[in-house]
Amino acid sequence: MLLASLVVTSAIAARAEEPVTLTLTIKDHRFEPAELHAPAGKPIMFVVKNLNTSASEIESDALHFEKVIPAGSEGTVHVRPLSPGRYNFFDDFHHATQGYLVVP
């Protein structure tokens, strides 16, 4: 009985840690959408699709990530569970390209 409880508890904990997946597209040196939303306390995985003809470097000091996405490709960025807030990210190769992650 104890073993069955541990297995169920482990399965529930593993599911609780599955990341929230957010898709972000970079097109014409703009983020689409420019504002994303995710719940507090959950890990996040950004799937970033770069439709530009040049590379983009998606970066965020607040979210602690930096990743180059080559032209015409996609990549993923993983973010730890967050507290509520509004977090900025940007394209370091094109500084006018700005976006936000809102965590209510």
How would you name each of these model-derived features?
Residues 51-71, 99-102:
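Histidine- and aromatic-enriched segments that form or immediately flank copper-ligand environments
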Residues 34-52, 74-82, 86-90:
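Beta-strand cores of secreted/periplasmic/IMS beta-sandwich domains, seen most often
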Residues 18-23, 69-104:
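Extracellular/periplasmic metallocenter environments
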Residues 24, 46, 58:
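Divalent metal-coordination and catalytic microenvironments
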Residues 1-10:
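Bacterial N-terminal signal peptides
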Residues 12-16:
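Sec/Tat signal peptide C-region and signal peptidase I cleavage site
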Residues 27-34, 60-64, 72-77:
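N-terminal post-signal-peptidase region of extra-cytosolic proteins
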Residues 18-41:
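N-terminal edge beta-strand
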